[in-house]
Every structure is written in C-alpha cells, then in structure tokens.
C-alpha cells in the first residue's frame, strides 16, 4: 500500500512538472524573449546574480528542515518560527548588500530596481521551498508538488492573458513588467503556502528562540556549502561577462 501511494505521488509530481514547467518556458518565457529582444540578456544576468545572492536566504536551511521534519515533526514545528525569523534577518542583510552593490558596481537606476525586484522574487521562492520542505518531511508529497508549480501556473495565466488575449498586450511587455508580474505570482504563492503551512503544521508561532539560530546554521552548514559551490559554478558566468563587457566598453 505504501509503495502504491509512493508511486502515485511520484507520478502526480512528475505529471504536474512535465505539464506546467515546459509550458511556462516555451509559451511564456520564450514569448517574452521574442518581445523584448536583446534586453532579455540583461534580465538573465541580473536573474543569475539574484540567484547567487539568494544563497543568503537558504544557507542549507531547506534541506536541513526536510531532514528534521522527516525525523521528528514535533521538534521541527518548534523550530518553525525561529527559522522563519532567521530568514527575515537574512533578508535584511540581503537588502543591505543590494544597497552597497549600487556603490561598487556601475549599473543604472533601472537596472538597480530590476535586481532588487528579482531579489525579492528569490526571497519568496526560498520561503516557498522552506514551506515545501515541511510538506515533504511529513510526506504530503502532492502538496509539495502543487506548490512547486503554483507560481508558474499563476505566471502562465497572468502573462498568457497579457501576451495572447489582451488587445495590444504585447506593448505592455518589457523586462520590468515581466519581473513585476513574476513578483506578484511569487508573492501570492508565498502567501498561500504560508497559510497552508500554518493550517496543516500548526506550529508554535509564539515560540521564537534566538539562541537556536547559531546551532541551526551550524547544522545546516554542510548543505549550505554544497549550494554555494553549485550556484557559483552554474550561475556566475553571466555576471562576469557583463562585468568585463562594461570594463571594455562593449555594453
């Protein structure tokens, strides 16, 4: 029975991802690229940079939460509020980093707003993944699968309406508007995931133990190291190309 349930959940997750994610890539993302042209390259650079900086939001906490909730859900619930507060503190550090970035990197105000917006998007993504780690830990795999595609599903409906149904909607499409629509989709997904996590897990929201933050970071460090190395390896090339093109006066 357990094996049947496992394969059923696995097929459900694979089915959702095979339908929703390719649709978002080929129907929405590709259409936006065609509309904005070369400006999408700038979006890609800042998306990669925001992804690198999003390491601050995770630090291996999601993998740590999945393991902890699978081992002892009651202990994991007690850590919920503490970890969430930790994420807010890391978000403040990230904002400070973005503010300092403006003084060390030659970017325009429009580009600065774009990277800030994409950074907030990564913050919502990281927290949605955090909630999903609890759902996976308590073996609510269908719920985990649903929230893995909810933001893209919302993006398909919202950007799909602008691109294909709204008269002259293509005139509204720009890198800034695309990032803004993504922001709305991630924000809504974050709110729904947060409410669902509170309803299902019923964590102790009033139990915030700041003295547990350092032990949590210490336990999550092995996961964080893997994330840091893989993210830098796969994402830093676009930012380096932009940096050197600015120095050479190409851009």
Located regions from the model:
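Signature of the first transmembrane helix
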Residues: 4-62, 95, 121, 156, ...
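Alpha-helical transmembrane segments of multi-pass membrane transporters/permeases
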Residues: 10-19, 77, 116-120, 135-161
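Transmembrane-helix boundary and interhelical linker motifs in polytopic inner-membrane proteins
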Residues: 2-4, 35-39, 53-86, 136-142
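Helix-loop interface residues and adjacent transmembrane-helix termini in multi-pass membrane transporters
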Residues: 34-37, 108, 137-138, 172, ...
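Hydrophobic alpha-helical transmembrane segments
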Residues: 112, 116-119, 146-201
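Alpha-helical transmembrane segments of multi-pass membrane proteins
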Residues: 52, 56, 92, 96, ...
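Interhelical loop/hinge segments that connect adjacent transmembrane helices in multipass membrane
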Residues: 1-6, 171-179, 191-234
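Alpha-helical transmembrane segments of multi-pass membrane transport and lipid-handling proteins
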Residues: 18, 22, 57, 81-108, ...
């Amino acid at each position: 029975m357990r094996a049947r349930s496992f394969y059923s959940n696995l097929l459900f997750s694979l089915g959702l991802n095979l339908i929703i994610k390719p649709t978002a890539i080929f129907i929405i993302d590709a259409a936006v690229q065609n509309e904005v042209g070369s400006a999408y390259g700038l979006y890609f650079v800042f998306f990669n940079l925001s992804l690198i900086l999003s390491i601050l939001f995770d630090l291996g906490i999601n993998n740590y939460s999945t393991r902890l909730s699978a081992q002892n859900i009651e202990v994991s619930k007690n850590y919920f509020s503490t970890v969430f507060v930790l994420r807010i503190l890391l978000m403040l550090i990230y904002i400070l980093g973005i503010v300092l970035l403006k003084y060390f990197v030659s970017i325009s105000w429009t580009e600065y707003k774009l990277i800030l917006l994409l950074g907030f998007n990564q913050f919502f993504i990281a927290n949605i993944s955090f909630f999903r780690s609890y759902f996976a830990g308590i073996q609510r795999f269908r719920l985990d699968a649903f929230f893995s595609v909810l933001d893209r599903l919302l993006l398909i409906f919202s950007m799909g309406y602008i691109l294909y149904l709204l008269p002259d909607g293509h005139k509204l499409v720009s890198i800034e508007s695309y990032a803004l629509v993504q922001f709305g989709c991630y924000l809504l997904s974050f709110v729904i995931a947060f409410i669902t996590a509170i309803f299902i897990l019923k964590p102790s929201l009033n139990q915030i133990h700041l003295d547990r933050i350092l032990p949590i970071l210490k336990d999550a460090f092995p996961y964080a190291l893997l994330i840091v190395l893989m993210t830098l390896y796969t994402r830093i090339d676009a930012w380096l190309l932009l940096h050197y093109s600015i120095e050479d006066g190409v851009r």
